[in-house]
Amino acid sequence: TPVEATDYAENVAAYKAQKRPFLSFMSGISAGACIALAFVFYTTTQTASAGAPWGLTKLVGGLVFSLGVIMVVILGSELFTSSTLTLVARVGGKITTTQMIRNWIVVYLGNFVGGLFIAAVIWFGGQTMAANGQWGLTILATAQHKIHHTWFEAFNLGILCNIMVWVAVWMSSSG
């Protein structure tokens, strides 16, 4: 039931927020690496799809990128976007505001380190030169597309992304 799902989410969030910061940081590294690997999958599908219809290309890209969130959930890693669900435990009075914010900061930094690690492995492994350099050009084109959003557009797209991750995590705990 929704009430049981909320109780479960509160307890999981309270557990995450009360974990030792080092464990949250390591879990954050794992999640950051998973999302970075998903971006590798996404980039590969987008690089190889020049002649495919736009909608099909985006569907395949979205499906393979979703593997990142699936890996995070299966591994029990901490992704910043899902860690913001600790707000449920804060509202329920199970954790303090300090515990919640500390968790957010530690997990965010862990995600950054995990993503940076995969980026370094990709760079030093020469993956950017795959498909005669087209793989690396796809990364650059994706980045260029992202920086052309206004601040307001980027903020709202971030909210939409966070909602989608929340729903995915919530659904995984409701089964």
Identify the residue ranges that each predicted region occupies.
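Alpha-helical transmembrane segments and their helix-helix packing motifs
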Residues: 1-175
